[in-house]
């Protein structure tokens, strides 16, 4: 019996990883997925080229209307760390196709901002501020300023 999965090519996997700076595309994670290994001739990679719509029938977010070429295309892929890849496939109601597509778009936009700036700090700051609202408040009993972080759902244009 042949392979019934429409897997990405190596070139597609590389393109997915490189277009987001080899960082997880989940805006709540953004973990670097590749780095040095103790063996100087190797790298450590924890990144995964995940399918937005499943590569095979019965998989998460499978779309029967897609052709095999569409299922294994760059457009149907997203670069994630291993944890986030497992997460999106475990709860498909919480992580629908449209959300994953918005993550991919935001991750690519963030990566290009990092490339265009002299330091990655402004791009990362813009990314963080678009995801978080930070409000200072004073704790009267200890007389110190504390920080409270509220998570706000991102609105992707």
Name each region found by the language model.
Residues 17-25, 73-77:
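Short metal-coordination and nucleic-acid-contact micro-motifs, chiefly zinc-binding Cys/His arrays
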Residues 1-21, 33-34:
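A boundary/linker detector
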């Amino acid at each position: 019996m042949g392979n019934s999965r429409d897997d990405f090519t190596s070139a597609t996997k590389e393109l997915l990883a490189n277009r987001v700076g080899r960082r997880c595309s989940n805006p709540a994670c953004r973990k670097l997925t590749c780095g040095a290994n103790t063996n100087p001739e190797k790298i450590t990679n924890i990144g995964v080229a995940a399918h937005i719509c499943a590569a095979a029938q019965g998989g998460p977010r499978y779309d029967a209307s897609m052709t095999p070429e569409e299922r294994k295309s760059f457009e149907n892929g997203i670069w994630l760390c291993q944890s986030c890849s497992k997460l999106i496939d475990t709860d498909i109601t919480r992580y629908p196709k449209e959300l994953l597509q918005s993550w991919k778009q935001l991750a690519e936009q963030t990566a290009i901002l990092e490339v265009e700036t002299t330091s990655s700090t402004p791009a990362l700051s813009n990314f963080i501020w678009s995801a978080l609202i930070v409000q200072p408040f004073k704790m009267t009993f200890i007389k110190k300023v504390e920080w409270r972080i509220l998570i706000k759902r991102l609105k992707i244009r």
